[in-house]
Amino acid sequence: MRLTAKQVTWLKVSLHLAGLLPFLWLVWAINHGGLGADPVKDIQHFTGRTALKFLLATLLITPLARYAKQPLLIRTRRLLGLWCFAWATLHLTSYALLELGVNNLALLGKELITRPYLTLGIISWVILLALAFTSTQAMQRKLGKHWQQLHNFVYLVAILAPIHYLWSVKIISPQPLIYAGLAVLLLALRYKKLRSLFKRLRKQVHNKLSV
């Protein structure tokens, strides 16, 4: 039985709640001592993990819609992607304001360049910013064939973001490895597409170098 447009609308409402409830919990935890001994790190890791969850959920939609034969499920992909960007922005903001502090924001650029795991994180965020900004149908029409080329960069985020997480933790624990494993699995489901993209990219680079 295929999902109807009405059911997808309610699914979108549920996904909005899924994006909002973690924020409400975080606010409650901050105000009621629900965080650990290092609340700043806890906030950073919580916002980062939530962004990763929405990234993985976004990547899950296409294969799920295909294998479950639920084409309308694709309509939820943009929503999940925007929540991923929102939580990634909270993650970056928590680092800038809580880790560095308002008085030290001038150091942000230096930190992002000199710390490799932060470099991976900011590259991922910039890509997500571009994808969020161009996610509307109007931008899709305006960009034409270039729209899909741009949005293929989500696969690069799926590689960089888990590495950023793994690199940022002091002690390797199962959790970042699980996120990395899920990202690899979701990318593996797109093996043929990724191989085609890589071949096309390699050909373009070769042609430019040959000029």
Curated annotation (Swiss-Prot):
Binds 1 FMN per subunit. Pfam families: Ferric_reduct. Its main location: membrane. The keyword ATP-binding does not apply. It is a multi-pass membrane protein. It comes from the Bacteria. GO terms for molecular function: electron transfer activity; FMN binding; heme binding; metal ion binding; oxidoreductase activity, acting on diphenols and related substances as donors. It is found in: Cell inner membrane. InterPro entries: Fe3_Rdtase_TM_dom (IPR013130), MsrQ-like (IPR022837). The chain crosses the membrane at residues 17-37, 82-102, 116-136, 153-173. Keywords: Cell inner membrane, Cell membrane, Electron transport, Flavoprotein, FMN, Heme, Iron, Membrane, Metal-binding, Transmembrane, Transmembrane helix, Transport. Disulfide bonds: none annotated. GO terms for cellular component: plasma membrane. GO terms for biological process: protein repair. Coiled coil: none annotated. Its cofactor is FMN; heme b. Heterodimer of a catalytic subunit (MsrP) and a heme-binding subunit (MsrQ). Belongs to the MsrQ family. Part of the MsrPQ system that repairs oxidized periplasmic proteins containing methionine sulfoxide residues (Met-O), using respiratory chain electrons. Thus protects these proteins from oxidative-stress damage caused by reactive species of oxygen and chlorine generated by the host defense mechanisms. MsrPQ is essential for the maintenance of envelope integrity under bleach stress, rescuing a wide series of structurally unrelated periplasmic proteins from methionine oxidation, including the primary periplasmic chaperone SurA and the lipoprotein Pal. NCBIfam families: PRK05419.1-1 (NF003830), PRK05419.1-2 (NF003831), PRK05419.1-4 (NF003832). PANTHER family: PROTEIN-METHIONINE-SULFOXIDE REDUCTASE HEME-BINDING SUBUNIT MSRQ (PTHR36964:SF1). This is Protein-methionine-sulfoxide reductase heme-binding subunit MsrQ. It comes from Shigella sonnei (strain Ss046). The gene is msrQ.
